[in-house]
Amino acid sequence: MKEMNRREFLTLSGASVAMLALAACGGAPSTPVAPTGKEAKVLEALNLYRGELSPLTLDSGLNKAAEEVAKMILLNKPLDDMNSYAEFDKAIAGYKKAEAYQPIGLSMNVETNKAAPRYVCQDDAKLMGEQLMAQTGDPALKQLKSPKLKLVGIHVFEYGSATYWVAVVAEGGKTA
């Protein structure tokens, strides 16, 4: 067995303590994140659309779910089986009623079963909010009027020559 000098021992001990601390807390909790850039504009637009309802809070775990929705769109393949949704389902697991709400900004072609983006991201949050208010026939958007919704995840992405956004909502955070 190799003898360690003091520095090696302290380094190893410190790493062990850090690993034990992470293991004890069960990993990083999903927490609200401060929106920046385009996500902040989309969040502002969504809250403008909600009107008098309490504002939605951006959640890092739901951001991952929104990213999975964008990946489904970018694949440009038919979403024919449940495996197509596996990563999205993992990302929303544990969120209160997240599975009950449709992703916002996702449009499905019923003939090809391919996903497409619906809402273009713009620099003017007020204009985006007004455009959301003018939309008709989008059940995913109508669900934003639910007072039960508290959290949102947003992902902004490039598709073709435009920038789009998608959002995923939940009534509450992850349960232990």
List each language-model region with its residue ranges.
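Second-shell loop/turn segments in exported
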Residues: 31-36, 51-58, 114-119, 126-130
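Short, well-ordered surface patches within globular domains
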Residues: 33-95
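Short arginine-rich
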Residues: 20-21, 77
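Cell-envelope/ECM-targeting effectors and their regulatory/trafficking segments
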Residues: 12, 28-30, 45-48, 151
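A well-ordered secondary-structure block
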Residues: 88-175
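N-terminal secretory signal peptides and thylakoid transit peptides that target proteins
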Residues: 1-20
